[in-house]
């Protein structure tokens, strides 16, 4: 692109945005170091105060960081600078002379008028023209060096002059080396104060008493060993002090040991009490568990005994009923058979009697021969029937006796079982008591 085209483009942009980029900026430096720019009309004849139909004022103001009017004063006021004696001459010459500071391709001229200081810049480029970057870093030896206003420099000069009058050896007190040196001086001052206090104490001591000063503030007194009254009252302390210190230290150690032992004993007593409570609780829980176990065992034993006795009783009753039924059935069967026999005998006798009238002489003969035999048979049958009845009655009596004996045996068995249960329960209770006594004894 040509330069003319670029300038035309810039002019168009200035007209659209109501800005004049060709105006010259003059900087005015006030007493405190703040820079206020003032605008003059450029080649285009436009000013920021008169441009615009709506009458808007668009003032361009540049705010710069406050710097010192004279860079040489900042260099001389730096603590690394050895001598500060020429600062008064420099400040005096600032009011009369004019200093030129070259900044690259441009120059900054600082002039002192009656009311204040004015500065003007000439050169190429916007940044070089304003001198923004160079104003912040005027010949600084290091970036650590702070930028200070003139008021601050005046106060610092007064403080430095006061320090030089009071303590000329502490002119570099603000630097790290100066701080170390100052701490050493303070330490020496403390030792001097200790020595002065010791000397005052020595003035109050009696004649012949001397003091020895060591590095520590503690002092040792040496009393005279002459034959004065003070020597009689106060013996030599240098040897006894060591003995007394050792004795006191041993005494303190013994007291600490005794206190620790007593504390341990108290702790052990507390632990013993806690363990006793735990043992009592465990014993109570054990007794309750024993009671529960004994109840469960008793219930199980009673259930087993009831289960064994009931089947035995039912079995015995069934056997007795079967035997009684068998006996009764045999008795009645025998009686029925005897009755049948007796009926047959009677029937035979009746038939023989009826046959006598119908039959002839042969029948009479046979009947005469058979009569004694039939009579003998009937008599024997009757007597056998009577004997069987007697035997049946005797069997019933024996069965009743047997039933009574079985009931007695069942009762005796139950009694023996109850006795066994009682003995077992007594043994379990005695064992529980023995365990409790063992726990309480131990």
Swiss-Prot record:
Chain residue ranges for the region called Disordered: 16-138, 151-194, 298-328, 354-379
UniProt cross-references to Pfam families, sorted A to Z: TDA11
Biased composition (Basic and acidic residues): 16-31, 183-192
Biased composition range(s): Polar residues: 56-76, 110-121, 155-176
Disulphide connectivity of cysteines: none
Keywords assigned by UniProt, alphabetized: Coiled coil, Cytoplasm
Listed transmembrane segments: none
Parts forming coiled coils: 270-300
Keyword NAD: no
Biased composition (Low complexity): 42-55
InterPro entries for the chain: Tda11 (IPR031388)
Family membership noted in the UniProt record: Belongs to the TDA11 family.
Annotated protein name in UniProt: Topoisomerase I damage affected protein 11
Organismal lineage: Eukaryota, Fungi, Dikarya, Ascomycota, Saccharomycotina
Gene name for this UniProt entry: TDA11
């Amino acid at each position: 692109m040509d330069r003319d085209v670029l300038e035309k483009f810039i002019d168009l942009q200035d007209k659209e945005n109501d800005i004049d980029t060709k105006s010259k900026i003059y900087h005015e430096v006030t007493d405190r170091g703040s820079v206020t720019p003032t605008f003059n009309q450029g080649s285009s004849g436009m000013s920021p105060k008169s441009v615009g139909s709506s009458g808007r004022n668009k003032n361009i103001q540049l705010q710069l960081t406050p710097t010192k009017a004279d860079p040489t004063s900042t260099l001389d006021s730096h603590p690394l600078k050895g001598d500060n004696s020429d600062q008064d001459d420099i400040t005096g010459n600032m009011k009369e002379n004019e200093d030129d500071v070259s900044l690259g391709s441009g120059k900054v001229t600082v002039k002192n008028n009656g009311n204040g200081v004015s500065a003007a810049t000439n050169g190429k480029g916007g940044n070089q023209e304003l001198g923004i970057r160079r104003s912040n870093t005027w010949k600084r030896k290091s970036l650590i060096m702070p930028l200070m206003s003139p008021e601050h420099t005046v106060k610092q000069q007064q403080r430095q002059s006061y320090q030089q009058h009071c303590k000329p050896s502490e002119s570099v007190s603000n630097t790290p080396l100066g701080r170390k040196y100052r701490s050493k001086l303070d330490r020496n001052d403390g030792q001097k104060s200790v020595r002065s206090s010791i000397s005052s104490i020595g003035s109050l001591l009696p004649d012949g008493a001397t003091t020895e000063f060591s590095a520590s503030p503690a002092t040792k007194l040496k009393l005279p060993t002459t034959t004065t009254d003070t020597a009689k009252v106060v013996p030599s302390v240098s040897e006894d002090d060591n003995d007394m210190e050792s004795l006191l230290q041993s005494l303190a150690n013994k007291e600490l040991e005794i206190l620790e032992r007593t504390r341990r004993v108290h702790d052990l007593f507390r632990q013993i009490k806690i363990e006793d409570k735990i043992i009592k609780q465990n014993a109570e829980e054990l007794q309750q568990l024993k009671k529960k176990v004994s109840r469960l065992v008793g219930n199980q034993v009673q259930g087993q005994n009831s289960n064994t006795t009931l089947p035995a009783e039912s079995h015995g009753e069934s056997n007795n009923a079967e035997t009684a039924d068998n006996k009764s059935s045999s008795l009645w069967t025998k009686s029925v058979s005897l009755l049948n026999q007796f009926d047959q005998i009677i029937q035979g006798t009746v038939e023989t009697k009826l046959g006598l009238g119908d039959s002839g002489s042969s029948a009479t003969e046979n009947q005469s021969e058979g009569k004694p035999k039939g009579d003998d048979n009937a008599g024997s049958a009757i007597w056998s029937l009577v004997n069987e009845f007697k035997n049946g009655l005797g069997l019933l009596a024996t069965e009743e006796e047997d039933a009574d004996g079985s009931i007695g045996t069942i009762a005796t068995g139950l009694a023996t079982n109850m006795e066994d249960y009682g003995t077992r329960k007594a043994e379990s209770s005695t064992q529980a008591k023995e365990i409790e006594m063992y726990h309480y004894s131990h």
